[in-house]
Structures are given as structure tokens and as C-alpha cells.
Amino acid sequence: MPHLEPLPEAKDQIFDAVDNNWVDVHAPIWSRPFLKLSRMDRPIGTWLLLLPCWWGLLIGILNTGSPKLNDLWIFVGCAVGAVLMRGSGCTWNDINDRKIDAKVARTKLRPIPSGSVSVKKAAFWMVAQALMALFILLTFNTTAIILGFIAILPVAIYPFAKRFTWWPQFFLGIAFNWGVLLAFAASTNFLTWPCIILYLAGISWTLFYDTIYAHQDKEDDALVGVKSTAILLADSTKSWLFISLL
């Protein structure tokens, strides 16, 4: 039987990316570092940002009694906006975490710490994505636009949260579930308590899944001095996660 050598991995392939993802296989080589900054090779995060938007839109439609043509645009606009804002947010995160990422096994091959993209180019890419998302936001009503601008605050704070609190996942939850409020307001032009309660439930959901995700980095995180719920809760994680679902 002939000896078969394993296929070499692309030297810039990110450790936590899916094998043979469309970015590594189909995207033009020049675009790959930028697409990876936006996590286009790992779409699960986009879904985690988009689903709360669609939840908010759904209860907004139920609140008004029937869907309107504008709700279809909100549905589509939220989908495109989730891709763009996740990309812009991840780029912002990587710009600020570049020194930490260089010391963590899972993240050291990301575009900025690996040298594939300069900080200046990453900043331009972040702004470009944010401006495209802004164009979509400005097609919504005034209440949604105001909420969209308020969302900049938790997005801006999140990369620094792991430096000053054991609960950075809470800040991620605030940012990632903001779409519940925004999409509901885009459909109804106001907010209600059921919408706010759903938003709070979404934050709890994010605490659940991102604490699990953080466990893969907890040894490296402890060494470089950053905080997370995975480190804080340690062996008690399962009990706390169960409580978060109640």
C-alpha cells in the first residue's frame, strides 16, 4: 500500500476555523486576511448575532398583529447588517487584542498577530464595514436608529472587558443581543417589557454558550492575565450554566 502524506495546512489557516471553509478554498488570496478578520470563515458567530434580531422582529410583528412590507426589509437588512457588524466588531476586537492573541495558541495565527494585515489596514476595513452597516441602519425608523447608535458603546467596550472584569461574557451578551431591541423597534417604533425580557434572556443565553467557548482558552488566558467566566467559575461551571438557563 502506498504511503500517503497528509495534506499540508495553509500556513495562515486559523486554528478554530472549519477545515476547507469557503474562505480558504474559494476566496481570492488577497482577500483572505480581511475575510478572516471578519470571521467569514466561521459563520456561527453571525448566526448568534442575527438570531436575536429575528426574535425581536417576530415579537414585533406579533405585537402589531400582522406583518408589513417593511418587516421584510427589516428581515433582510438585519441579515446583511449582522454580517457587516459582526465583521466590524471582530476586527475591532482583533485590533485591541493583537498582543494577547499573539500569546494564545488558538489565536496566534489570526491576521493581525501573524502579520498578514497591518493595524492600519485592519482599521480601514473595520470602518468600511461599519459604514455599510450604517447605510442599512439609516433606512430604519428613528427609534431603531437611536438604538443602533447606542449599541456602539457595548461593542466598543467589549474588547477591554476581559482586562477589568471576570464577566466579559456579560458585555458580549449586551452587544450580541442588542438586535432584539433594535429589530423590535424597527418594526413597531417603540419598546415593550416582553421585548426587554427577551433581551435579558438573550444575555443569559450568551453567558451560557460563550462560557463554554472560553474554556478552551482558560489556561492561556490565565497565563497572559486576562479574565473570563471560564476561569472564574472553573469546576463550578456546569452548575452556574444550569442556573443561567432558568
Q: Where do the language-model regions lie?
A:
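Membrane-embedded alpha-helical segments that form the functional core of polytopic membrane enzymes
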Residues: L50-N96, R106, A130-L137, I145-A156, ...
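Intramembrane alpha-helical segments
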Residues: S31, L35-K36, S88, T107-I197
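Soluble N-terminal domains of membrane-associated systems
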Residues: M1-P6
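Small-residue-rich segments of transmembrane alpha-helices in multi-pass membrane proteins
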Residues: W47-L57, P111, F171-S187, L232-D235, ...
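Multi-pass membrane catalytic core of lipid/isoprenoid biosynthesis enzymes
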Residues: F75-A82, R98-G148, L223-L246
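Aromatic-anchored, glycine/proline-accented short structural segments
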Residues: F184, L191-S244
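Cytosolic, membrane-interface loops and tails of multi-pass inner-membrane proteins
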Residues: L7-R32, C90-V117, T211-A234
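Membrane-interface helix starts
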Residues: R39-L49
